[in-house]
Amino acid sequence: MTAILPVRFTAMKWYGKGPLETYPDRQCGGRMGVYSEDVRNQPFYLRPQEYGLHTESRSMRLTDPDRADFVRFEAACPMAMSAVPYSDLQLWNARHPFELPAPEALYVHLDYAHRGLGNSSCGPDVLPTYRIDDRPCRFGFALEAGLGEREDNPFGPIPEEIPAYHPWKAVEEQDGTPSYRDPSDPDQRSNAGMV
C-alpha cells in the first residue's frame, strides 16, 4: 500500500529493524529497535533505485518538524515500511541523481510482503525463499494523524515514545469461531487460557 503525504513530513521514527535499510534477504545487520532519521538524509544509491525499506516494522511516525503535525501507521503484524521523497516511477526513470525532480511529496510504502533484492544485475536471481507468489493476501494497519502541539490542536500533544508492539494471539472460542486476544492485557490472557 502506498500513501502520499506532503513533503514536509521529513522526521521519521519507526519501531522495526534498523538503523539502516533492511530487505528480506539483507536484514542480518539490522536490529530491532526504535530509530529516528530525516527522510532526506537516508543513504541513497548512485544509480537511483528503490531504497530505505525497514523490515519487521510495527509502527512508523512521520512528523513535520516545523509544525509538529504528524501521521502515524501502526501495523497489525510485522510489515516492511519505507518513506522516501520520490515515487517508484521517478526512481525508475532516472539514471543519475541529478535527473530526479525536486521532491514534491513523500511516498510511504506499507508492504505485507516484499520481494528480496537478489543479485540479478551480476549474478543469480532472488532465492526462492525470498520470492513472492502472486496470490491474494490480507493485512491491516491503523492510521493516526494529529496537528501537533499548537493551540488549535484538538488531539493533544504528540506522544514522545512509540508504544511497545503487542502481537495479538489467535484463539478459538468455545463455539469454534476464531477470535483474537491481546497478550499484554492480563484479563484477556486469563480469559483465553494464556496465563
Feature map (PLM): residue ranges:
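Beta-strand/loop-rich accessory regions of lumenal/periplasmic or secreted enzymes
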Residues: 1-195
